[in-house]
Amino acid sequence: MATLSLKPSQRYRLSDWLTNSYLLSTNAERQRDASHQIRQEARILRNETNNQTVWDEHDNRTRLAERIDTVNRWKEMLDKCLTDLDAEIDSLTQAKESVEQSLQAKNLPLDVAIECLTLRESRRDIDVVKDPVEEELMKEVEVIEATKKVLQEKISQAFQHLCLLQEIRQQLNSDHRDKMETLEIDRGCLSLNLTAPNLSLKVNPTRVPKDSTTLQEWDDFTRFNKNRADTEMKASIELRETIALAIAQTNNELEAQRVATEFTFRKRLREMESLYSELKWQEKNTLEEIAELQADIRRLEEDLRRKMMNLKLAHTRLESRTYRPNVELCRDQTQYGLIDEVHQLEATISIMKQKLAQTQDALDALFKHLARIQADIACKTNTMLLDTKCMDIRRKLTVPAEKFVPQVDTFTRTTNRTLSPLKTCQLELN
């Protein structure tokens, strides 16, 4: 017979069972509702975050593109500014070279003026005079020294401004390189997408790097460099204009002084030639007067000798008549006539000797004055030769060096050329 075997365990009541089933069903409904709510919220969050992420990425991509455009515009402005700056540096360098050449060209007129002054120191005696030519030559030296000082100052200004432009160029180049590097980085960032390789999380990417600047500071920095470059380029243009003006003015001043000096030279030469002609005329007349005076002296001496013979004749007659005998030794008319003749001859001879002495003195005076005239002629000849040599030397200022051939040869023999009247006169004096 079968027996009932029950497991010894707790028995739940039906109400507990029903309650449990109800609770399970209710909790399942509640959990599903909560899960549904969470799923809806997750979908909303996903949609919102996706939209936000897409918008943020699009917004930042747009900002990055705009930033690239901004940096690129500044880079292009820097490109143009650097091109203009390089052109201005070249122009200012050429202007500096021009003023250096102009300064170097002033050495020739200075050497010529000093050579003329030195050459004119060879004047002799009374011709060593501070005449208008010397004053103009000294003024020419002063003008050249003043122009050289002005040009040297312009060279210094150009050099200093070139250094400043080079410094600005280095700053612009540095800024330009930074912007090129920035463009490369930003364009690389713009080209990145979700499928790009090497995407990874970084350590603290939102940190603010050291020495970061604000957008205003960035804009002010580049704008300051560009404005400074524009200002200095404008100043460089003005400096080039002043350099060109200084070169033109100094050349005009030097040319005006050269014309004035050479005019004074020509005027002085005409004065010397006029005086030389006057001295030659005086020399000719003096020589003629000396010749006539010498002829008169010879005639006077001859007459004096004849008067002496007449006196000897009268003396001999008187002496001979003293030997008349006895009463024949009378003082007759012949005696008185011979005595009067002796007195007359003695007076005549005395007067003639005085006149002869005066004539000799006059001849000596003429010879002395002739010597002074001839010495002055020699001085004038020497001075004219020196001034003519100076005029020939000054041809270097208007004739190119490769075409310059001296026309006056003062110190060496002149060959295959007719001597000038000045040299002919010098040879006559020698």
UniProtKB/Swiss-Prot annotation:
Which cell locations does it reside in?
Answer: Cytoplasm, Cytoskeleton, Cilium axoneme; Cytoplasm, Cytoskeleton, Flagellum axoneme; Cytoplasm, Cytoskeleton, Microtubule organizing center
Give the free-text PTM comment from the record.
Tyrosine phosphorylated.
> Which Pfam families does the protein's record reference?
Tektin
GO CC, one annotated term: axonemal microtubule
List keywords of the entry alphabetically.
Answer: Cell projection, Cilium, Coiled coil, Cytoplasm, Cytoskeleton, Flagellum, Microtubule, Phosphoprotein, Ubl conjugation
Its GO biological process terms? cilium assembly; cilium movement involved in cell motility; flagellated sperm motility; inner dynein arm assembly
Q: What is its main location?
A: cytoplasm
The domain of life is Eukaryota
Q: Which residues form a coiled coil?
A: 75-162, 226-380
Q: Which family does it belong to?
A: Belongs to the tektin family.
PANTHER family, from UniProt?
A: TEKTIN, TEKTIN-2
Quote the subunit structure annotation. Answer: Microtubule inner protein component of sperm flagellar doublet microtubules. May interact with CCDC172.
- Please give the function described in this protein's UniProt entry: Microtubule inner protein (MIP) part of the dynein-decorated doublet microtubules (DMTs) in cilia and flagellar axoneme. Plays a key role in the assembly or attachment of the inner dynein arm to microtubules in sperm flagella and tracheal cilia. Forms filamentous polymers in the walls of ciliary and flagellar microtubules.
What is the protein name stated in its UniProt record? Tektin-2
Q: Which organism is it from?
A: Rattus norvegicus (Rat)
Q: Which gene encodes it?
A: Tekt2
